[in-house]
Amino acid sequence: MYIDIIKNYTPTNELEAQDKKVMLAYIERHQDDILTRENEIAHLCVSGFILNKKLDKTLMIYHNLFDSWGWTGGHADGDSDLLAVALKEAREETGVQNVRPLSELPQSLDILPVWSHYKNGKPISAHLHLTVTYLLIADETEQLTIKEDENSGVEWIPVEALNQYCSEPALLPIYMKLVEAARKLLQFTA
């Protein structure tokens, strides 16, 4: 169950430990709608940080909403299988079908702000994404496809060039934390 996955997650730093604590407290009070967008203050989201097999490139999409290159992901929309959501979103948003988890367990927990915006002509108030992130591996030779209603680009970006592509500075430390986690996992499983 998704709550157990979050409870059993081992934070990598103090900020993650605090985010985990806040997430669990909020989930406890809002179990009836935390997996849906009906909770307009905060809801569970899932991201997939996709790397190539060498771990030197990451597959990013150009988010129309955030006007920046970033990871794949989306709302749980009632699905409590968070890894399945991460894989589904990765496939839908990039066109890559042969994507697999580097680990069955999440590698990051983050509370991220989403500023007010319009989606499909309707106003969306500012809110929080309680984000659970999985590390995914994909074949960089596979054909990429843009999902026009969400992104306007899909590209393999060298890890060392992320700061040149990502215009959301708060996400860069998270991305680098995930690259490091992937390298540790690959060392451990090799």
Language model features by range: what are they?
Residues 68-74, 156-157:
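A short, polar/proline- and glycine-enriched secondary-structure boundary/capping micro-motif
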Residues 1-12:
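N-terminal domain-onset segments
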Residues 77-173:
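Unchanged
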Residues 59-61, 74, 145-147:
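Short histidine-centered beta-strand/loop micro-motifs
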Residues 36-71:
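N-terminal strand-loop-strand
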Residues 10-47:
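Acidic, metal-coordinating catalytic segment for phosphate/diphosphate chemistry
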Residues 167-190:
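Charged phosphate-binding loop/patch that engages nucleotide di/tri-phosphates or the phosphate backbone
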